[in-house]
């Protein structure tokens, strides 16, 4: 039905025909818009429903925070209640089921700060050496602007350009889709930029060549986010 790996989100899969192998997909939004939650939803659906091994590189959150995010979403428990432990009796049952599902899911998490692409490749190759499971089939990176090249650079735009170019090369070399989360510049918050705050390619932070290297750029946007401000 789909050329690539289904995300589990039907409308998105209809538009993208799944996540294409070798594709670099940028998922961009302002803070608080839900890009990490959305990316984790895709990752868990791919791993749990499609049984495709997923590598999640989180440069912002720890493995424990990632795990808690996934568990609360899978169990359908409010994240605030999950954090405070204010759970109902039935929540514990849902949480136990979610924990079992996550334990069995082929998800590899890494929370190395400021990771480079070279380090990322080495870690994925080590995971792929496990003969008992298939190779990693999807890579998720949260988020692009926290990555480094491992070399001193005074020009952040050039550094991000180098990172996105090499992420695209890595996607092709490993024949897997890479979803890289990206921040948007503050310009999108200004009414003068565009009255609805809807993001555009020009709003990609440190953009450089992000739009040239990416096979697809997805923006997350919610009217309700701005209506409540």
Where are these regions (language model features)?
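Conserved P-loop NTPase nucleotide-binding/switch module
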Residues: 69-78, 145-168, 190, 199
């Amino acid at each position: 039905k789909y050329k690539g790996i289904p995300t589990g989100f039907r409308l998105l899969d209809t538009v993208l025909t799944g996540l294409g192998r070798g594709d670099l997909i940028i998922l961009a939004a302002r803070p608080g818009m839900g890009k990490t939650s959305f990316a984790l939803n895709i990752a868990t659906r791919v791993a749990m429903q499609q049984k495709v091994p997923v590598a999640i590189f989180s440069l912002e959150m720890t493995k424990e925070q990632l795990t808690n995010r996934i568990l609360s979403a899978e169990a359908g428990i409010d994240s605030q209640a999950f954090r405070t432990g204010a759970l109902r009796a039935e929540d514990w049952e849902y949480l136990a089921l979610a924990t079992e599902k996550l334990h069995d899911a082929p998800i590899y998490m890494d929370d190395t700060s400021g990771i480079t692409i070279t380090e990322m490749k080495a870690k994925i190759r080590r995971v792929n050496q496990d003969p008992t499971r298939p190779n990693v089939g999807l890579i998720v990176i949260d988020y692009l602007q926290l990555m480094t090249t491992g070399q001193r650079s005074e020009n952040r735009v050039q550094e991000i350009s180098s990172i996105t170019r090499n992420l695209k090369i890595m996607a092709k070399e490993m024949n897997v889709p890479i979803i890289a989360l990206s921040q948007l510049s503050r310009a999108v918050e200004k009414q003068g930029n565009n009255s609805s705050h809807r993001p555009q390619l020009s709003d990609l932070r440190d953009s450089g060549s992000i739009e040239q290297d990416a096979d697809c750029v997805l923006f997350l946007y919610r009217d309700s986010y701005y209506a409540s401000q």
